[in-house]
């Protein structure tokens, strides 16, 4: 599987999963040894360390490691809104969403003392484009960067992209996290040191790779009022139970949450919050009927949706932390009424199968994986489809990378899917468009293509309405059989301000780490 394909998968799934599921296949370890925190020290638990600290090539699962030390061009608040970062103004120039202008903040210095300039940001973007990281492909259509002034750039793209603010905020780690000119002059050091304009700087002398990462305040930070901690430490704790124990014993203060340990976290008095983000269910890939002729008929795909009792599956797998859905997004495009499109109706499912010429059902091959409870979801669906005559022949791949490869290679007519909420145009590139990784058979639909082309060039004021039409079309086509929203979230001790834990949205399910601050009086 190509590195670009892996990158596209990670934008769809790993953007959403972040560090939540990283420990699924990692052996247990004991909690870290106890130790006191310095005054106003934030101690974070993560399940895996970063392979590199270079923003241009870091895995998005490791975003917090760079967000502490680098400022984004645009800041995505935990509530999903955008606010100024290194850029004070931004927006599209003219019509068509191919030109984008950025005005940079005056007087900003990086941690190494170099100044923020338009020339420096141009150099940064050119580096990210050619670095081969997860976001390099996003800049593939970046045709030119014009420096229109000491603090002003105009970016021209060869194809429209209506979601550039999404990429220039923290979601676009690599693109958004601007590296200093001095850092770019010595790229080899970017893997182990930081060269950003963020609130903190890595203390490399106190850092032990893949164990402990220590950050201290950046004396040059442009927004000193929002430096909330005297020290930030990230401790690597691979096992979920060990991570929870570290929180309960006060050895760490904050971490991502997992619904499998949520009840115990609540019982221990921790602050918990979960946001629906990843839709889990079946991806009915073979819509042209190459391997499974039955799936070429929309009535069959709709029958599969009618045959699923979503509520019972969600309750069994996610408990109160999940919610049923028939949709692919929980952000722009989500329509509450679409969740009533396919009520549990086995009789309706059998009727549609009979009308399509399959009164006795059929057998459908599905590739799955235990990752993020994929196998559990597929087996639950299989039990319900059996009652309408559809037998799932499940091939589980314990190696998630093998699963991705098989799913994307058009060797199976259906697959488990766990896909995180993204802006609709970004989803077109990753989920449902003809070149999307999750569209292995390159399915197309004239109406879907028309709407996506409209979205690509639409002004922001029209994007939500077009996204809703796209989602309605996807649900009607029944290209997928979503079952429920798998929740993502975070845990915190009472030391942390509750707002840092609870303010999240579907497109931003994990908090912006620089927004985490001490509770009042702590």
Task: Please place each PLM-identified region on the residue numbering.
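Structural transition elements
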Residues: 200, 291, 322-355, 373
């Amino acid at each position: 599987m190509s590195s670009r394909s892996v990158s596209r998968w990670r934008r769809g799934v790993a953007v959403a999963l972040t560090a939540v599921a990283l420990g699924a296949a990692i052996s247990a370890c004991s909690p870290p040894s106890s130790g006191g925190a310095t005054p106003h020290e934030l101690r974070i638990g993560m399940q895996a360390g970063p392979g590199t600290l270079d923003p241009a090539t870091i895995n998005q699962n490791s975003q917090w490691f760079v967000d502490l030390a680098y400022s984004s061009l645009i800041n995505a608040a935990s509530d999903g809104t955008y606010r100024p970062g290194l850029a004070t103004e931004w927006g599209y120039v003219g019509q068509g969403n191919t030109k984008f202008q950025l005005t940079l903040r005056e007087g900003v210095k990086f941690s190494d003392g170099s100044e923020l300039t338009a020339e420096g940001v141009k150099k940064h973007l050119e580096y990210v484009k050619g670095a081969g990281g997860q976001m390099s492909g996003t800049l593939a259509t970046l045709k030119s960067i014009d420096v229109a002034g000491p603090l002003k750039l105009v970016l021209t793209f060869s194809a429209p992209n209506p979601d550039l603010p999404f990429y220039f905020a923290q979601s676009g780690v690599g693109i958004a996290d601007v590296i200093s000119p001095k850092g770019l002059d010595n790229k080899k050091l970017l893997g182990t040191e930081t060269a950003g304009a963020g609130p903190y700087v890595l203390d490399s002398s106190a850092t032990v790779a893949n164990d402990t990462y220590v950050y201290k305040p950046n004396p040059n930070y442009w927004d000193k009022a929002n430096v909330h901690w005297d020290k930030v430490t990230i401790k690597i704790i691979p096992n979920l139970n060990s991570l929870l124990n570290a929180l309960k014993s006060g050895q760490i203060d904050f971490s991502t949450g997992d619904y499998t340990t949520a009840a115990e976290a609540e019982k221990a008095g921790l602050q918990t919050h979960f946001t629906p983000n990843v839709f889990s269910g079946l991806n009915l890939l073979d819509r042209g009927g190459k391997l499974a002729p039955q799936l070429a008929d929309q009535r069959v795909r709709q029958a599969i949706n009618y045959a699923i009792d979503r509520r019972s599956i969600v309750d069994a797998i996610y408990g109160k932390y999940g919610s049923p859905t028939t949709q692919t997004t929980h952000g722009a495009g989500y329509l509450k009424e679409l969740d009533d499109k396919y009520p549990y109706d086995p009789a309706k499912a059998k009727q549609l199968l009979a009308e399509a010429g399959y009164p006795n059902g059929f057998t459908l091959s599905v590739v799955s994986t235990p990752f993020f409870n994929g196998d559990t979801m597929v087996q639950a669906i299989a039990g319900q489809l059996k009652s309408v005559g559809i037998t799932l022949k499940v091939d589980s791949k314990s190696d998630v990378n093998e699963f991705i490869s098989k799913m994307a290679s058009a060797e199976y007519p259906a697959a488990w899917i766990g896909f995180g909420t993204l802006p609709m145009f970004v989803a077109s590139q990753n989920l449902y468009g003809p070149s999307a990784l999750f569209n292995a058979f390159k399915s197309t639909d004239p109406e879907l293509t028309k709407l996506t082309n409209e979205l690509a060039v639409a002004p922001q004021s029209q994007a939500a309405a077009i996204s809703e039409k796209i989602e309605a079309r996807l649900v009607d086509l029944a290209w997928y059989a979503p079952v429920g929203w798998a929740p993502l979230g975070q845990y915190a001790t009472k030391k942390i301000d509750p707002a840092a834990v609870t303010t999240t949205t579907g497109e931003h399910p994990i908090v912006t780490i620089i927004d985490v601050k001490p509770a009042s009086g702590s």
